[in-house]
């Protein structure tokens, strides 16, 4: 099958990465022929229904279980032997580069995977390779570029920027045709690393499906309870302990509040224990991971959406959380941490920003919205207008589609995407 763009991501399909799924569908809808590759299959029990809309098959670079290891190992060894025989000087030069830079084990794994991927994308007729993250996937795509001279690009989001080696990231930027970033904060971080290659770094927000995520068709019956919603993986950077602490303060103040948390992750039991120790277990529900349709319905039951994100010691952080955009598109007022890319989305008209890691500040903001229901309604309406104007998925995808047009090349259209 002749294709134009080999699209590589870390895991596919992953429930929490709807932005990757949406981008793939959007590019295919825009007429960009894609061939999907993923380093691994997440093998999650729950799969987004829209995965069925993806036209391209998916090839996995990592073995799919013990029985597949021998096949993957043999094809990987054969691929590297073929690449060495095809151009010994090029191949040994890359090996020397890896040894000289003293890269760790993950780099060797990336190189091994890249050898197999190089022959796969060549056989598929790819003219360009794009990686969906700046760390592992971009490293694999970079090695494909070095092994084959195929042009490549990558997207940088949040964690993948801040946990990467700056020197290695600078080399990947230098050799890339372009780099996409989804927030100004990510753009600034990448351009600082890029130095003289900063012009390659482009600002291209993900966007959200404003038709799927829309306001409730009929008003919900009002009562005295403030319904708070948070959607996201239960991991440290999401700041869930801050949210639980804020709920405890609201309850102590005598306010009627009910909090729903949608998402799964390693902090689930710890958060439940925290809620119990603070005496707010009856006020907090953990629903686990949900498919898109159920998540969209959950926004219709919310008065306020909370994004209590924090920056971790290793630099890991959110960019612009997709759930935040979904809530705003659904016409829900938002309260979020003033950190990373979040302030780029929330204007004073559509939400409240609070200091990260501060349960008291979050509680104060929620108390204000509890006491002023009219303000919640105004903010929700403004939030939807803002997302439609600036973060509509279709418009965002159409902005980057020319970068992947096989007839026009990949560098000239980049000038039409924002650089700041």
Per-segment meaning from a language model:
Residues 18, 226, 230-249, 255, ...:
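A conserved mid-protein helix/loop that constitutes part of the nucleotide-sugar donor-binding site
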Residues 164-167, 191, 208-224:
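Acidic anion/phosphate-binding donor-loop and adjacent secondary structure
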Residues 185, 207:
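Carbohydrate-associated surface elements
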Residues 272-293:
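Nucleotide-activated donor-binding/catalytic signature segment of Leloir-type glycosyltransferases, i.e.
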Residues 283, 361, 368, 375-390, ...:
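A short, well-ordered alpha-helix in the C-terminal region of glycosyltransferases
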Residues 300-315, 332:
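Acidic donor-binding loop of glycosyltransferase active sites
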Residues 324, 329, 333-336:
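Short hydrophobic beta-strand element within catalytic cores of glycosyltransferases
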Residues 348-359, 368-374:
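Conserved acidic donor-binding segment of nucleotide-sugar-dependent glycosyltransferases
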């Amino acid at each position: 099958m002749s294709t134009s763009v080999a699209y590589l991501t870390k895991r596919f399909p992953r429930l929490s990465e709807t932005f990757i799924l949406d981008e793939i569908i959007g590019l295919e809808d825009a007429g960009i022929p894609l061939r999907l590759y993923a380093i691994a299959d997440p093998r999650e029990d729950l799969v987004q229904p829209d995965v069925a809309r993806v036209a391209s098959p998916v090839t996995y670079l990592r073995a799919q279980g013990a029985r597949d290891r021998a096949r993957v190992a043999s094809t990987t060894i054969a691929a590297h032997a073929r690449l060495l025989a095809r151009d010994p000087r090029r191949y040994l030069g890359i090996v020397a580069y890896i040894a000289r830079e003293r890269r760790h084990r993950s780099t060797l794994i990336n190189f091994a995977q890249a050898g197999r991927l190089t022959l796969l994308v060549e056989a598929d007729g790819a003219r360009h390779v794009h990686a969906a993250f700046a760390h592992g996937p971009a490293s694999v795509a970079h090695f494909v570029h070095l092994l084959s001279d195929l042009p490549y690009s990558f997207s940088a989001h949040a964690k993948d920027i801040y946990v990467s080696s700056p020197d290695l990231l600078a080399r990947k930027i230098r050799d890339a045709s372009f780099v996409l970033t989804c927030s100004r904060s990510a753009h600034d971080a990448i351009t600082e690393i890029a130095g003289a290659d900063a012009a390659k770094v482009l600002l291209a927000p993900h966007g959200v499906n404003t038709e799927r995520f829309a306001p409730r068709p009929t008003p919900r019956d009002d009562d005295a309870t403030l319904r708070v919603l948070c959607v996201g993986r239960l991991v440290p950077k999401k700041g869930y302990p801050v949210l639980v602490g804020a709920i405890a303060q609201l309850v102590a103040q005598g306010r009627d509040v009910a909090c729903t948390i949608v998402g799964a992750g390693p902090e689930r039991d710890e958060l439940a224990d925290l809620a119990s120790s603070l005496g707010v277990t009856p006020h907090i529900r953990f629903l686990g991971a949900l498919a898109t349709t159920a998540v969209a319905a959950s926004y219709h039951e919310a008065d306020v959406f909370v994004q209590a994100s924090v920056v971790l010691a290793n630099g890991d952080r959110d960019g612009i959380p997709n759930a935040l955009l979904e809530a705003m598109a659904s016409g829900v007022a938002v309260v979020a941490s003033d950190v990373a890319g979040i302030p780029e989305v929330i204007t004073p008209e559509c939400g409240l920003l609070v200091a990260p890691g501060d349960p008291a500040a979050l509680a104060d903001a929620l108390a204000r919205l509890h006491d002023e229901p009219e303000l919640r309604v105004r903010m929700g309406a403004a939030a939807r207008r803002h997302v439609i104007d600036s973060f509509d998925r279709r418009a965002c995808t159409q902005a980057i589609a020319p970068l992947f047009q096989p007839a026009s090349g990949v560098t000239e259209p980049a000038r039409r995407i924002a650089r700041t």
